[in-house]
Amino acid sequence: MAFRKENKIKSNFSKISIGLASPEEILENSSGEVLKPETINYRTYKPERDGLFCERIFGPIKDYECHCGKYKRIRYKGIVCDRCGVEVTEKKVRRERMGHIQLVVPVAHIWYFRSLPNKIGYLLGLPTKKLDSIIYYERYVVIQPGVKAEDGIAEFDLLSEEEYLDILDTLPKDNQYLEDTDPNKFIAKMGAEAIYDLLARLDLDALSYELRHRAGNDASQQRKNEALKRLQVVESFRASRGRNKPEWMIVRIVPVIPPELRPLVPLDGGRFATSDLNDLYRRVIIRNNRLKRLIEIKAPEVILRNEKRMLQESVDSLFDNSRKSSAVKTDANRPLKSLSDSLKGKQGRFRQNLLGKRVDYSARSVIVVGPELRMHECGIPKLMAAELYKPFIIRKLIERGIVKTVKSAKKIVDRKEPVIWDILEHVMKGHPVLLNRAPTLHRLGIQAFQPKMIEGKAIQLHPLACTAFNADFDGDQMAVHLPLSNEAVLEAQMLMLASHNILNPANGAPITVPSQDMVLGLYYITKLRKGAKGEGLTFYGPEEALIAYNEGKVDIHAPVKVIVKDLDENGNIVDVMRETSVGRVIVNEIVPPEVGYINTIISKKSLRDIISAVIKACGVARTADFLDGIKNLGYKMAFQGGLSFNLGDIIIPKEKETLVQRGYEEVEQVINNYNMGFITNNERYNQVIDIWTHVNSELSNILMKTISSDDQGFNSVYMMLDSGARGSKEQIRQLSGMRGLMAKPQKAGAEGGQIIENPILSNFKEGLSVLEYFISTHGARKGLADTALKTADAGYLTRRLVDVSHDVIINEEDCGTLRGLVCTDLKNNDEVIATLYERILGRVSVHDIIHPQTGELLVAGGEEITEDIAKKIQESPIESVEIRSVLTCESKKGVCAKCYGRNLATNHMVQKGEAVGVIAAQSIGEPGTQLTLRTFHAGGTAANIAANASIVAKNNARLEFEELRTVDIVDETGEAAKVVVGRLAEVRFIDVNTGIVLSTHNVPYGSTLYVADGEVVEKGKLIAKWDPFNAVIITEATGKIEFEGVIENVTYKIESDEATGLREIIIIESKDKTKVPSAHILTEDGDLIRTYNLPVGGHVVIENGQKVKAGEVIVKIPRAVGKAGDITGGLPRVTELFEARNPSNPAVVSEIDGEVTMGKVKRGNREIIVTSKTGEVKKYLVPLSKQILVQENDYVRAGTPLSDGATTPADILAIKGPTAVQEYIVNEVQDVYRLQGVKINDKHFEIIVRQMMRKVTIDEPGDTRFLEQQVVDKLEFMEENDRIWGKKVVVDAGDSENLKAGQIVTARKLRDENSMLKRRDLKPVEVRDAVAATSTQILQGITRAALQTSSFMSAASFQETTKVLNEAAINGKIDKLEGMKENVICGHLIPAGTGLREFDKIIVGSKEEYDRILANKKTVLDYNEVE
């Protein structure tokens, strides 16, 4: 009898390292060698000995029973049977014991020569093709040339069979009997053995030195890059000193995973269901055994070689079957699932089993509404509760002595005997449950409720909780989970209770806002009706008013006067007389007095503000009660008012006829113009669309007036709309106005929707014609189809966001940074999009802010800007405030509380441990799905806003122009005017008295200007106007036109219009890049004055030889046709920004300030040269197909686009620096969400952008351990530079024995060494200062950033699992388990919130438990103190 050791891993580890396994390690972890390919005996169903399921190796199949049955039962535990060699133990060891297969010949590991970057190839400097031919036994490789070196044969040479045999023939006789270490011996081998020898012979230090030299000195960029790539692999092996050896990439022993992880289950009928891995292992074993036998019988080399190659292939497919070109398939032609495949993807180990586990104590059912529940309650069906709380009931049954054993208690519960209901009531008190609705898009998708037992089988949900869950009662299901431990119960009660989650973490607005019926009821009773019964009465208090109402003396809507409690200016509660209505008095019975008297009509918007005010004034608990009161009142009043609508409430305005008629007339006019040839087809189309858009919006306005004045605004449809209960202006317009313009169906992948120019003139009340109906349905169905497709994209975006930001946690109070972001009002042209108040609220100021007029200190540096302070700042003349931001936070891990500011879900400063990264990701991802789901509500109606085409003075002001260049013309009315020909013209409106700049506008190129610089204008004066449909090119000189390179069907095509017979010249992209269409302007004598390039797509409106005056249009370029604003712009745009992708047509941007000169045309590109005042010259090539936005002699600033197109974030980063690009991304993404009406606080975007900017790339490595072009963490970079700061590098070691050239030493060590040498009169050490590394900030897309995180576990569970693990293993990476994902994977508490490591010592439980623990601790503590 022998005993075996047990080695268990402790679960409280703090880091995980990964590396290559050495053959010794594999042997150490193995419990025995698998020799036979057999699995189990098909008759007895017992495992075969030495096979893949052998009990001797992996442990017994039944608990405490050996194979032959000699030892049974637990008393023989640990004994190894002398007959069958099986250890008597539990059967679960079959889940953890490994075996191994000893291979006859080594094989290469497929991860390290098949996947890119090819590690073995880089180490040996061999290309993949050559490597393959060695590994798969096609070529010999010379490992040591020996005596053949003089014949020009070098190491790493490949030899074919013949060459190899020739060389063997010419070798001296005794050569093959020399020792392998003898430098004269010629050695060449093939297969993985050869690679093994080559890798084992590598001297990494020498190789590293040589490659560094090559990378530093090679002139050719390609060879330099090659050296750098190899260097990275070499350095990673050197860095993991001895933990990883290169030759371990060659496998000599294949580990066999435990049998329970690759089960084999007998089905009925003598068939077996098996894991694919068994097949793969069997092939390896069969081939290995066959090779053994062939070697024993001394088979010819050819046969052996073939068998070796097959062995290599079988091990390849075991490790990674998907990498191979010819994957091993089953009979059903399905590729087998190899070890790598079981890690990858959504169904792989990481995402399926480690990050997403199924849990016990959970239930799921349909939800129904529970209007009588309190805010923190939910209704749980009796049967469900009995099952969920089963163990608790059993415990109580035994405690109360109703039963003696657990078994009998179980029976009672299963039979649902009446005694258990009473116990269940008791157990459920103070033991909340968690409700969750999939998809859980943000943290409000899981909330805790106090359960109430109900009859029936459906879960009851509080109506106000629906918004957060995005639930409705049309058959949605929800899952219930039960928190078990004391800690979990406490967290559920304190942090997750629904009545505590009233605010939305994305923007701080209340999320439990009553909707639909509730809003309608409140709106109805707070609306006033002139001439109602009892109008004008006066009451001495709310009570009297209510009595009068109940007695029927006064109508609920009648305007009356009542003395009520309200707030005065200082916020004290006083009695005042207010003109109000009984309805409003009833509402104010519920409103807490601290908020004052609400004397307005209540809509959904105002309700949200009231709830915010209640939270600020009274705290969360009172707000929950208030919400319950509001809910009850709202439902009651909506029911009492009988607020439904009938067909008569949908009123069609009588002006509709005339409006439509007028539209037709205008369209007729446009078509006439087109037929006469005054306008192009494109212009006609744009104008028609414009006309109908105007008609539609005018009709909408009239409709709104009509419907709102109907029955004093008590029209049911109008009330639903106005209160915000249901419906939108769009929808009502379609019910009783006209459906309007619809989007045109387009082919998949086509850019932006065109609009059908014939509008649908009918509305739904009149009914649509067949054609109209057809167009209508198309839009509606497209909306539904889009939704389904986009939801997946939104989910994937959320996943990437979470992955990039999950390790951002508040880790300290204050990082002490002095930097911040400057915040101002966010404006677009002239209209304020986000006020300074919104942007600084809840942030922390960097400096003291002092009121410029009164000199009072508004807020000290490092203090939170509260509502009051923000209001004061907004009202003062202060334009900008520098605030702390996550983007400038200098915390080493996570971010600090001061830089983050206020936690939006609580309205207090954020606490340490808050998982702000995940909150940010959820806040951005959750509306992503909303964005996508928003398309179809208008039923595919085209939202097209007519472009404005003029600048009109909004105030009386003085004008100042900048960069203005004009030419004088006479416009079509005969007035003198100027045409702007500069691209950078700006006009500033300046207040005549104060000199403050009121607004700035860009004056577009080609606009007609009606004022002069410095002129003072009245409000409403037209400053400039331009053609909204076409971009133009205007001549600045008078003369004769001469075309060059304008050749029919090469650089232009003629489009003749069938309708008008007019012909237009349209420039097309020519295949022949030497032909550049351009127009020269010549003087009378034929001297060249100016040349204009004609851009692709331009319509030429003049003829060759024509005389032109300055200011005339030469070319019109139709602007993109009015596109239907659909979210299709939304989500892809957000993705594009977060992935830092370059847009499809990037603009060419100037990197310096300077003057523009046009260069030659090179290969279809126009050269633009920018010369700065300092004489620096930059050349840019712009494709001729693009319109060039600058002209000869223009002065441009750095960052100005030279051609049309979108600016790329990379350019902004390179030219304007990190801050500019951070603000650009935040603002651009915000724009997309704003367009959809989604409010998200800036700080969430800032967190994501911070994660995108974590890395720098090394320009000059200096004396640091970095390599050129290496991408490293900013922090790591700074630490490494600090490490070598002030140290010296040995240039010449002199006579020193301790130091050698190239070593980095401290000044002190150097001094000691040199003084010692000096005393002994030896040559001193020569040194130079250590050079620090330099770097450039880079911007990474979220996917790249998530894959480059410091934690390999997090990266591997995200994407490209095998590649990440492969890299990590070679680098011998260590995961410190700092983020959330890693800890979830390891089954630890997450390092955020209550899981912060500093809270480890907190114990939640009853007093008795605490005392017991203390008693146990005391003995330990005394012992520790002695130490």
From Swiss-Prot:
Residue positions binding Zn(2+) 1: C66, C68, C81, C84
Keyword Transmembrane: no
An annotated Gene Ontology molecular function: magnesium ion binding
Binding positions for Zn(2+) 2 per the UniProt entry: C815, C889, C896, C899
UniProt KW keywords: DNA-directed RNA polymerase, Magnesium, Metal-binding, Nucleotidyltransferase, Transcription, Transferase, Zinc
Binding-site residues for Mg(2+), renumbered to this chain: D472, D474, D476
Catalysis performed (reactions): RNA(n) + a ribonucleoside 5'-triphosphate = RNA(n+1) + diphosphate
UniProt EC number: 2.7.7.6
Cofactor note as given: Binds 1 Mg(2+) ion per subunit.
Top-rank lineage group of the source organism: Bacteria
GO-annotated biological processes: DNA-templated transcription
Coiled coil regions in record: none
Subunit structure: The RNAP catalytic core consists of 2 alpha, 1 beta, 1 beta' and 1 omega subunit. When a sigma factor is associated with the core the holoenzyme is formed, which can initiate transcription.
Family named by the database record: Belongs to the RNA polymerase beta' chain family.
Name of the protein in question: DNA-directed RNA polymerase subunit beta'
Name of the gene: rpoC
